[in-house]
C-alpha cells in the first residue's frame, strides 16, 4: 500500500487492523536495532536510512507484508534461512503472506546484520 502519510505513526494508523500489531513490532525492532539510522517515509512507506540512503523498509502491500532489506550482502546471507521457512523472496524483499508467518527472531538477526554491514545497496 503506497501511502501519502507524512510520518510512520500516521502510516501505521492506515494499515489493516489484522496487520497493525506485526507492523508496529517491525517498527519497534527497526528503531531498537538500527542505531544511527533515520526513520522516515519514502516510496510511500516506512524506511530506515543511513547517510541519506534507504537500507531497510517495510510496508503493508495488497497481498503481503513486505520487509525490504536493500543491502545485498545481508539479504544474501539470510536467503537460505528464509527459503527454508517457505518465505517468498525477491532481490531485496521478504514477503510475508500472513502476519503470523513473520519469524521475529530471524528478523532481529537480519536487522542486526544490516546495522553492522556496509555492503552494496540494491539499485
Residue ranges and their predicted role:
Residues 1-123:
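Charge-dense, helix-prone N-terminal extensions
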